[in-house]
Amino acid sequence: MMLPQNSWHIDFGRCCCHQNLFSAVVTCILLLNSCFLISSFNGTDLELRLVNGDGPCSGTVEVKFQGQWGTVCDDGWNTTASTVVCKQLGCPFSFAMFRFGQAVTRHGKIWLDDVSCYGNESALWECQHREWGSHNCYHGEDVGVNCYGEANLGLRLVDGNNSCSGRVEVKFQERWGTICDDGWNLNTAAVVCRQLGCPSSFISSGVVNSPAVLRPIWLDDILCQGNELALWNCRHRGWGNHDCSHNEDVTLTCYDSSDLELRLVGGTNRCMGRVELKIQGRWGTVCHHKWNNAAADVVCKQLGCGTALHFAGLPHLQSGSDVVWLDGVSCSGNESFLWDCRHSGTVNFDCLHQNDVSVICSDGADLELRLADGSNNCSGRVEVRIHEQWWTICDQNWKNEQALVVCKQLGCPFSVFGSRRAKPSNEARDIWINSISCTGNESALWDCTYDGKAKRTCFRRSDAGVICSDKADLDLRLVGAHSPCYGRLEVKYQGEWGTVCHDRWSTRNAAVVCKQLGCGKPLHVFGMTYFKEASGPIWLDDVSCIGNESNIWDCEHSGWGKHNCVHREDVIVTCSGDATWGLRLVGGSNRCSGRLEVYFQGRWGTVCDDGWNSKAAAVVCSQLDCPSSIIGMGLGNASTGYGKIWLDDVSCDGDESDLWSCRNSGWGNNDCSHSEDVGVICSDASDMELRLVGGSSRCAGKVEVNVQGAVGILCANGWGMNIAEVVCRQLECGSAIRVSREPHFTERTLHILMSNSGCTGGEASLWDCIRWEWKQTACHLNMEASLICSAHRQPRLVGADMPCSGRVEVKHADTWRSVCDSDFSLHAANVLCRELNCGDAISLSVGDHFGKGNGLTWAEKFQCEGSETHLALCPIVQHPEDTCIHSREVGVVCSRYTDVRLVNGKSQCDGQVEINVLGHWGSLCDTHWDPEDARVLCRQLSCGTALSTTGGKYIGERSVRVWGHRFHCLGNESLLDNCQMTVLGAPPCIHGNTVSVICTGSLTQPLFPCLANVSDPYLSAVPEGSALICLEDKRLRLVDGDSRCAGRVEIYHDGFWGTICDDGWDLSDAHVVCQKLGCGVAFNATVSAHFGEGSGPIWLDDLNCTGMESHLWQCPSRGWGQHDCRHKEDAGVICSEFTALRLYSETETESCAGRLEVFYNGTWGSVGRRNITTAIAGIVCRQLGCGENGVVSLAPLSKTGSGFMWVDDIQCPKTHISIWQCLSAPWERRISSPAEETWITCEDRIRVRGGDTECSGRVEIWHAGSWGTVCDDSWDLAEAEVVCQQLGCGSALAALRDASFGQGTGTIWLDDMRCKGNESFLWDCHAKPWGQSDCGHKEDAGVRCSGQSLKSLNASSGHLALILSSIFGLLLLVLFILFLTWCRVQKQKHLPLRVSTRRRGSLEENLFHEMETCLKREDPHGTRTSDDTPNHGCEDASDTSLLGVLPASEATK
């Protein structure tokens, strides 16, 4: 129907009205306003559909927005988004496959791009995406989705012997297809067997012999973990995507244990032979690849044949035939059946039968041992009979321990035995084994360990031989000189004397000889004979003693009579005879520590440290019968020696019985001074203490060991989880959850080096499994051992501008969680504040005062008593996780200076100011105390406002300490802790210059009341030596500078802050400002708004100070508010106490790595490295905006120093936010070298580059002194969310890959990121170690963030909707009033307004009548217009009665 000519029609989207009555106008106004409000809250008509597919559950994805259908781009699309689509449309979504929509050429809108879903959304548009209609795609990238339920998929095994064997086929899209064997393994096969309800005790898998050529290949590169419920839940290429042929189709058989059988064949009994396995009636062999002794043990145990002998080579057995069933078998030894072991699959066609495995079990051994071709039954070549055949043993690694076992097994005398090389056998077959290892305690040779396989070859083709003898047959002597303790060494063997060749002769050999002859110690060790050459046999050669042998023939040698020497190589030995020897440690804390001294030739002398090591120290401790659990090297507290240096270049093996048995340069031969004297500390566990230091709790940090008062940090060499487990257990800190290597920075720290770690992780104490070595130098690569134990609870306060207030969060196992108010008491708050070095708790809060947390809440109730030093030490009570809502999270406000008081006054509200710092009370210096500080102090003490503050001895002194802390309060703070504070470089303050305060809450009046008409606050009435500062309404400050002592000058006067004009502004004027603010002298009087233009009044102009005034307003000027300036002429000042901070590098432009320098007194100078820690480095980096952490290092060799140093000995807790708050030595300019200066490299800074906004681009990280990128492997919205939140850029809209913002440069720092999305920093997520990646820059990751925080976004969007709707309603109301006015004018001209004369109507009635008259028009024919107005597809409001608005027919009621 046509719209009448005189009808009113308003259309706003779907909301429109057309009425000609007053009520209709009001209805339209309210309806349109409501509709706008609804539209503001996204109440749009959004729809979703799939088109051009096989049905409503497949096809191209289309979204209806603003009445128009459009497609979705495939950028960022994944199966999670497909699942959301299927779920929203009510389609089956147990499997949702996405496809591209390029098969159909489309036109029109592309509504969505970069869609990223979590999977729990109820509609597609609730996922993250670009703005509607914003994209960089074409329709060839339209995304499509196919939704499938379980009913659409199937799995079966076909063409096998039964339903549990055959070719693997999968049903997809109503069609059965095969699976390619690429990536197929036993985990995947196990999923198939379990899904089909088939047994899975043993699984045989391979490829088919008869491929299914007419079927599709559905899956390829399938990878299962083994615990999936269905095969299609495993990772794969995608349905129908493959690069295979049907010759690669997978087949498998699922076996029950009843289908399997094991045997040993080819031996003399059932417990020895070739290993064979029967599967479904067919016997096959096992390939030796990866076979080990544990596998052999499993075979013997399964067959009830005892245990496996520790050799498996049976070269005489006939090889197997038929199939090789198993390959790559690897057992732990605990398995009950061989098929329970891990293996690489069945039917191996690459393994030949010559590699078949054989086993001999202990219950089936048919073995015999003999010595052949010797002088008797107890000497000769070693031979072993196996299966009626004699075999020899290769002499490779053959030693006396093996010979001892042979002698004992044959029942031969073994008080003396020797090993030898035997001549080849004419009877025995080939070498049976070529490497056997015995301890000497075995009862039979086959109880020794061996290398596991038969050997057919032997290096140099030498058989092992043995000579077993009795001690009565042997003797020893030294001949050719006039002393029985000096001469040529001779040995009697088989009734004949013979010599010993010098090959391999050593000090230990000589020590055994001297000890055996009762001749003391060896004096001269090396050298061949210069006596008359002997005759007769050379019995021994290549003698090698350990040093603890009783006889020289007990040492290893080449065999009796086996040598390659002549008699001029005979050994001579010189022993000490009756000489007296001695050893001691002097100058230490006890007899087992100190400087090492040796007594020789009647004199004590020292030992030089050339070549000295822990083995030599161990010999000393053992010789002195001192404990040796931990051995320290170095003098420690002992001084250097004097006199003779007896030994040098000492080299021990560690098992010598005394120090002089070790190799050395000879008595008295050295090239040393006493500065190189050796020191030794011998200790055991009773002298040792273990703790963790430098962490945020007692269960985290670096490993520190205290030995007899000497403290050292454990070096990180060999550091790992096995050692960390022992540390955590010993400290009662649970188990280790993280180990790390941290750099060392302090020169004076001793170190402990792990020279031998045998920790398995199950030991009760670290001393049970580690051999130690003291080091007075740095660790290898300067890295120290650090760890975090499971009992570690690291707290923090977040959500506030100050580090000592905020929402309580506790970190455990890399996750931060908020704490519920019911789980946290005031006692716990006090413990937390003390742990954070934040003083005491002054308040607890509940709710979102400090913002709401995210993720799960803490699942423990802290039951602190209040006296604990760390929150982790409080008793806890577990409760179910996430039982607390985020609106019940607890917040804490701490104050370091809650311990503040006024003492020595008339009441608690007047007196000398004292604060407690680090547990010590002290007064404050009055040098930088001002009225604003006094106001805050009185407010904090609930003592009203400050009346006056005094300097000197106005009230008196009693404090021992005078602290140098300088508070810079504005006057409106509630606590001193909220004021800016500096202490760095503060000079000592002498007594008599301390500050006192009188507050209005005092019970007494000020002794010297201030005079209102005196502008100078320093009154002459104050006693000499004191100064009374009256508090007035004039204040001074510097703003917009880089520190409190530089900036634009502003004065508080008459209730407003204002500026000063630069007319006549000079150093004299600026000097008054600097002195008033305690900022030294003026360096620069800046003009022309150098620090930016101010606002408010310009209070002073044409100042003309002499520089001696106490206040700026005492200088001559035009008068308050009198000027001819603008703010572009605002004056500023830079004072000598102006400080700045930087990291300076001579070659690098990046300001986040280099020498730490401070600007003071007009020049840059360095900072001393004494006491600089990683915590201080972190404060510097955060203060400079260079990241969260820093690494301190020594000066690079190529760098030069600054030449002088400004400050040193900085001490700072990690909770400070500025280095200016740290304690230090006073400011002092002194010459310094690069080695004395601090060098810092900041870490863990993040930025985005290459994007179109500051919140989008390629992700880059500053680490190890350079910028690098992040690889996009596993990059997703969770990782992007962490980046966006860390940058303060709101929430993540998209996680972009493939260098979407261009390729970066430098190192790719992080790869394989795994974030939860609630981490504070990207590097808190799990990832590969720093710098380890397999990516190129074409894979650089990027992000696109919303640009504002979620909180502000949500708040602003709701408020914006309300504001806009209200404005729109008011606008319509104004238009309505204007319309009424126009109607009145028109009626006065044409149709005079008629009002009922019978009774006065209400205003509403008159307005209604006027509207009705005005709106109802007659057409040219005089007929009334119709109300039949077409609705144009919108919702007609003609019959709508809104609440509070009556229809016209009811208006007069």
Swiss-Prot record:
Keywords: Cell membrane, Disulfide bond, Glycoprotein, Membrane, Repeat, Secreted, Signal, Transmembrane, Transmembrane helix. One of its GO terms (cellular component) is external side of plasma membrane. Residues 1418-1453 are annotated as: Disordered. Glycans are attached at residues 42, 78, 120, 161, 334, 377, 441, 548, 637, 972, 1013, 1084, 1104, 1161, 1171, 1318, 1354. The chain crosses the membrane at residues 1360-1380. Disulfide bonds join C73-C137, C86-C147, C117-C127, C180-C244, C193-C254, C224-C234, C287-C351, C300-C361, C331-C341, C394-C458, C407-C468, C438-C448, C501-C565, C514-C575, C545-C555, C608-C672, C621-C682, C652-C662, C715-C779, C728-C789, C759-C769, C820-C884, C833-C894, C864-C874, C925-C989, C938-C999, C969-C979, C1061-C1125, C1074-C1135, C1105-C1115, C1181-C1242, C1212-C1222, C1271-C1335, C1284-C1345, C1315-C1325. InterPro entries: SRCR, SRCR-like_dom_sf. SUPFAM superfamilies: SRCR-like. Isoform 1 is highly expressed in the spleen, lymph nodes, thymus, and fetal liver and weakly expressed in bone marrow and no expression was found in peripheral blood leukocytes. Isoform 1 expression is restricted to the monocyte and macrophage cell lines. Isoform 2 is only expressed in spleen. This is Scavenger receptor cysteine-rich type 1 protein M160. It comes from Homo sapiens (Human).
